[in-house]
Swiss-Prot record:
Organism of derivation: Eremothecium gossypii (strain ATCC 10895 / CBS 109.51 / FGSC 9923 / NRRL Y-1056) (Yeast)
Subunit structure: Monomer.
Keywords annotated in UniProt: Lipid transport, Signal, Transport
Name used for this protein in its record: Phosphatidylglycerol/phosphatidylinositol transfer protein
Its biological purpose: Catalyzes the intermembrane transfer of phosphatidylglycerol and phosphatidylinositol.
Propeptide: 19-37
Classification via SUPFAM superfamilies: E set domains
Domain of life, per lineage: Eukaryota
SMART domains associated with the record: ML
Length: 213
């Protein structure tokens, strides 16, 4: 159903915001559970269902993406279908977490009904139960840095009832010389190499001041 919204978040909103590189402590138990407790969604996309021990309102039956795998600076078309077993009303929300390796780049909560309207899907809350088939095209930002990105998106009703949990793992290869010359210098390459060094311990950011502890 609204899988295209989350996939848009995973690729457009999440990775665009990820270039700010807000590094935080890697101690999220919920993240570990999502990675271990997951099952691939039919269709060949990198997305899997997660939190399999919970009852979800949305049964995502299939997701197909073109191109597969995604490419930076290119459009990505997502086709999805699924069954919604209960209503979704105003106040529903989705949490999105993005990591580059073990580094947390983004952890944010979005208004699900607002995202539905702004993503031009022809849907608005309240949503009734039923079967949905959707197609959505989003743009993958050119400035996505190379690396393996892990994403977890969890959606909930206004009463905190689980709607769905999706997790994805997408790899963007190193930039070719011609691509580097066209890429905006939003991130210092030397800093990126340091951040991606597996020997490096993540810094813990002080939430009050924004400085490293």
């Amino acid at each position: 159903m609204r899988v295209s919204v989350w996939y848009g978040l995973l690729h457009a909103a999440a990775w665009t915001r990820a270039v700010s590189l807000q590094v935080s402590e890697d101690s999220d138990e919920q993240w570990t559970v999502a990675l271990r407790d997951s099952r691939p969604i039919p269709g060949g996309s990198p997305l899997s269902r997660c939190d399999l021990d919970e009852d979800h309102l949305l049964d995502v039956q299939e997701i197909e993406i073109t191109p597969n795998p995604p490419h930076r600076g290119k459009n990505l078309t997502v086709e999805a279908r699924g069954d919604l077993f209960g209503p979704v009303e105003d106040g529903a929300y989705v949490t999105v977490e993005v990591r580059l390796g073990y580094i947390k780049l983004l952890s944010e909560t979005f208004d699900l009904c607002k995202e539905l309207e702004e993503n031009d899907l022809g849907l608005q809350c309240p949503l009734e139960e039923g079967e949905y088939e959707l197609s959505k095209t989003v743009e993958i930002p050119q400035q996505v840095p190379p690396g393996r990105y892990h994403v977890v998106a969890r959606a909930y009703t206004v009463d905190d009832e689980p709607i769905t949990c999706l997790t994805g793992d997408v790899y963007f290869p190193p930039l070719m010389p011609a691509e580097r010359s066209r890429m905006p210098r939003l991130i210092d390459p030397r800093r990126m190499r340091r951040l991606m060094d597996p020997r490096r311990k993540p810094r813990i950011m002080d939430e009050g001041s924004g400085a490293a502890a």
